[in-house]
A protein has these predicted regions:
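Generic hydrophobic, amphipathic alpha-helix propensity
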Residues: 12-21, 37, 62-66, 70
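Helix-turn-helix
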Residues: 15, 22-57
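Short hydrophobic clusters on alpha-helical segments that form packing/core surfaces
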Residues: 16-24, 96, 159
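Hydrophobic alpha-helical connector segments
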Residues: 61, 75-107, 155
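Hydrophobic/aromatic residues within well-ordered alpha-helical segments
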Residues: 62, 66, 70, 85, ...
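Hydrophobic/aromatic-rich alpha-helical bundle segments in the mid-to-C-terminal region
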Residues: 122-131, 143-198
């Protein structure tokens, strides 16, 4: 069965968004140019406006896609760890602060990759960024069902900040040590037997 023009256009649109979702995590918002994204997607720069009204519209969609991809990857990791019988919180901490996150900038959490850039963006991109942050906090709260929203916010901030600093140190012993220390501290604080979370 042949694809319709609308199907081809949608597939092309999805390819552009996928490329941009990786690019914003790899280069930050400022490092994402329309021409580069289109070239990496195997398209000409001129075709961009058949899919998006503006670069800002692309960034919003790319951030949403990056968040969905990261969320799906974390969910898969949680399911694998849950099969081992660990708590949801332990699974989340182990997945988010796993050593493999040091080298997976373009496929990892967009909040950790872009938090420093978020305040300097347009209103639309900042709004999409705020949605990602709220979803991260909600995910932490779901893993710690007895925790307050404030506690979930602190834990989310610890996860993001630790990952950012560990990446700044690099995919080396120092970066891995920082992740390990944060995992241990978070699990001791919130996942130890008899721990009361507020």
């Amino acid at each position: 069965m042949s694809r319709t023009p609308d199907t081809r256009k949608q597939e092309t649109h999805e390819r552009i968004v996928d490329v941009a979702a990786r690019a914003i995590r790899r280069h930050g918002y400022a490092g994402v140019g329309v021409a580069d994204v289109m070239k990496e997607a195997g398209l000409t720069h001129g075709g961009f406006y058949a899919h998006f009204d503006s670069r800002e519209a692309l960034l919003v969609e790319a951030l949403e896609r990056a968040g969905r991809q990261s969320g799906e990857a974390i969910t898969r990791a949680l399911e694998r760890r849950a099969a081992r019988g660990v708590s949801a919180f332990r699974a989340l901490v182990e997945a988010y602060l796993g050593d493999e996150q040091l080298a997976s900038l373009e496929t990892g959490c967009p909040v950790a990759a872009l938090a420093g850039d978020m305040p300097r963006q347009s209103d639309a991109v900042r709004a999409a960024s705020a949605v990602r942050v709220r979803r991260l906090v909600a995910g932490v709260q779901a893993a710690l069902p007895h925790a307050s929203r404030a506690t979930a916010s602190v834990v989310a901030g610890t996860l993001v900040g630790t990952l950012q600093l560990a990446r700044a140190l690099g995919a080396n012993a120092d970066g891995r040590a920082m992740l390990s220390a944060a995992r241990k501290a978070l699990l001791q604080q919130y996942d130890a037997p008899g721990t009361a979370v507020r």
